[in-house]
Regions:
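FAD-binding beta-loop-beta segment adjacent to the flavin cofactor pocket
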Residues: 133-135, 142-151, 336-379
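Beta1/beta-strand and adjacent pyrophosphate-binding region of the FAD-binding site
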Residues: 2-15, 31
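Flavin (FAD/FMN) cofactor-binding and adjacent substrate-gating region
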Residues: 100-185, 190-191, 197-204
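Core beta-strand elements of the Rossmann-like FAD/NAD(P) dinucleotide-binding domain
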Residues: 3-5, 210-220
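Glycine-rich FAD pyrophosphate-binding loop
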Residues: 25-44
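Active-site substrate-recognition segment that forms the wall
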Residues: 21-25, 49, 75, 83-91, ...
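C-terminal lid/capping helical subdomain adjacent to the catalytic/cofactor pocket in oxidative enzymes
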Residues: 120, 362-436
Length: 436
């Protein structure tokens, strides 16, 4: 059986659902295909959903700053009815501890241009603002079994604080909100089905074939399949001209009780998200009683690259839990390290430079929103608009490879050069971590 539509979006995570919404808003007929049973059931469900602006590229900072304005007015962004439960943005701030390989100036030079407010704290102010935090400098990160792990601090740390940062409380609900908004604009979703073939004719995509045999005829196909994006690219026969590689990477985020009084730093407010590349971890509030603890890929840690993202266990391991939570306890001396791991694991779709690819491909009509590298949840509201600008421009005849398109942001008015996310780019400036 053959069905016809304008666009097929493969993947209904927070990125794919945003793309579906914006393309449907533009008047196109959109069908979304996803292997799971609902929006945000893949990598999105394991996201820490941190909203921060500390990217080493100007395009990254502009995208995150614009996206903040979408999260702050989430119901308006979605045009959601009054009774619909929505994910909520928690403005608790983000505090980035000093580290030599990513100095404050790497970010503040962009903040000054874009208009992102920030504060630079010395060690004394950091201690006064966050008294539960050990301000010692311990760089470089070490395995927790290393004899030097508990060595005395070599100096004291300051920090870069962005008061407008924070996190979204329910990343999966955010994806479902976007999917529901897309459906209100006419998009349809096919759950629990996979693409088995990308159909093409004369150098142009003409649709996809689903596992039950249905063919979806479409002039545009968007790959937003997360860690499964490489498999879909291979089905489409694209990727030969990419200058950045992509690989699935399994990651864990752990759940622990917060130290007593940790959140008592601002009345009813929570403590900020703490990004600690000095020890190789980050710490995010989870309500007022708990914390989420993740890693920042320090060089001393082996990374769990996967050939097949389906091979990644969704359960946290004792070894990673012990490593990450012990590092967090070094920074927060009041934190206890439980014996039993608790948390989630997911698979990132990681590029060589930890920067996403939002681009066309050598197959006309086949577009990619991939390589999100664990740091693009925050930008999801904008990515749908970036991809709509890209698709409308290229399908209208613009040669994006020769002259990159520009997207003008609705809220901030900032122009974003889409060439920054090109598949053919030179490797972007990067910390070499999930921070981008």
């Amino acid at each position: 059986m053959t069905e016809s539509t304008d666009v097929v979006v493969v993947g209904a995570g927070v990125i794919g659902s945003s793309i579906a919404l914006e393309l449907a808003r533009s008047g196109l007929r959109v069908v979304v295909v996803d292997k799971f049973g609902g929006a945000g059931n893949g990598s999105t469900s394991a996201s820490s959903a941190v909203v921060r602006f500390t990217y080493p590229t100007i395009a990254g900072v502009k995208a995150a700053w614009e996206s903040l304005h979408c999260w702050e007015a989430w119901r308006d962004h979605l045009q959601a009815p009054a009774g619909e439960p929505l994910a909520a943005f928690n403005r608790c701030g983000v505090t980035l501890l000093d580290v030599d390989f990513a100095p404050c100036s790497l970010f503040t030079r962009h903040f000054d241009k874009v208009g992102v407010p920030y504060e630079e704290w010395d060690a004394q102010e950091l201690s006064e603002r966050l008294p539960a935090v050990d301000t010692g400098r311990y760089f470089p990160p070490r395995p927790v079994d290393d004899d030097e792990f508990f060595a005395d601090a070599s100096a004291r740390l300051g920090a870069l604080h962005t008061p407008d940062g924070g996190f979204v409380d329910d990343p999966q609900l955010a994806a479902r909100n976007l999917a529901a908004a897309a459906q209100r604009h006419g998009a349809t979703f096919r759950w629990k089905t996979e693409v088995t073939a990308v159909m093409r004719r004369g150098g142009r995509v003409r649709g996809v074939r689903l596992e039950e045999g249905t063919e979806l005829s479409a002039g545009v196909v968007v790959n937003s399949a997360g860690p499964w994006s490489g498999q879909l690219n291979r089905l489409a026969g694209v990727g030969g001209d990419f200058t950045v590689g992509l690989r699935p990477l399994r990651q864990e985020v752990h759940h622990v009780a917060a130290p007593a009084g940790y959140h008592d730093v601002g009345g009813d407010r929570q403590a900020p998200v703490l990004v600690d590349m000095d020890l190789g971890t980050y710490i995010r509030p989870e309500g007022r009683e708990f914390l989420l603890v993740g890693g920042t890929e320090p060089e001393c840690d082996p990374l769990e690259w996967l050939d097949d993202p389906d091979d990644g266990s969704p359960l946290p391991t004792v070894s990673q839990f012990r490593t990450q939570v012990t590092r967090a306890a070094r920074r927060l001396p009041g934190l206890r390290v439980p014996n039993k791991p608790k948390g989630v694991a997911g698979v990132y779709d990681v590029t060589d430079d930890w920067t996403p690819v939002y681009d066309r491909t050598e197959l006309a009509g086949f577009y990619v929103a991939i390589g999100t590298s664990g740091n693009q949840f925050k930008n999801a509201p904008l990515v749908g608009r970036l991809m709509t600008t890209l698709i409308q421009g290229v399908e209208g005849g613009h040669d994006h490879d020769r002259s990159a398109l520009t997207h003008t942001c609705e809220h901030t008015g900032q122009p974003i050069d889409l060439g920054a996310f090109s598949r053919r780019r030179r490797p972007a400036a990067s910390t070499g971590t999930v921070l981008g």
